[in-house]
Amino acid sequence: DLIANPEVKDTFVKRSQILKEIRAYLDEKGFLEVDTPILTPFEIGASARPFYTHHNTLNMDMVLRIETELYLKRLIVGGMDRVYEVGRIFRNEGMDPKHNPEFTTIELYQAFTDFHGMMDLVEELYKRLAQKICGSMVIPYQGKQIDMGHWERLTMIEAVKKYSGVDFNDWATDEDAIAAAKAHNVELPEVPTKGAILAEFFDAFVEDKLIQPTFIYDYPVEISPLAKRKPDDPAFTERFEYFIDCTEYG
């Protein structure tokens, strides 16, 4: 396949170049690259199903990690202000074009900033990658022109209103949110609170519209139990995710 299809080889080359540039960028910003354990004695972090193995010398069952988050956070607590890891993750779950049991993540943590500062860092990194790897801020991809030079920033409330016409602020009670969900054929979550229903509206009306780079922030606390709550509105959190071509990238 590599011999017959040059574009396949080009994918490998670009992946290597991207990782090199990410490391260079983060190193310039004062981040320290670290390696955290891949084999762990118990399941930690995300709710994904892990792969199990057995350590013969210690005679104990172990798991392959399903995330790098908790060990990196320990390093931050221990006094390392900026850390990142390029690491393999293993999840014993289904496969589709967006999911693989073994994949690479790039996870980073920085003390003494806020989520707006982290959004700035992510945007700057992607712009650098586009220019250095592709030679342009506009990248053709599957018939679309992705403009890495412009990133929209919307709260989840703003995004839902923009793409569905439904205004979260019109819901005074959970019952109002339930009625709105039924009127728009939106699936009700197991615990149908206003915030949880807002997230269902996002999934139903917004995510598949986010073709150009977009930050979504101010997530409801119901779906963000570990995120810092907003001081002025504890029903929402200082959390963001970003989407490109209808896909969440971080």
Tell what function each PLM region has.
Residues P37-R128, I146, H150-G250:
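A translation/RNA-centric and nucleic-acid-associated enzymatic feature enriched
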Residues Y25, L125-K132:
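Conserved short hydrophobic interaction patches
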Residues D1-F51:
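TRNA-binding/sensing appendages of the translation machinery
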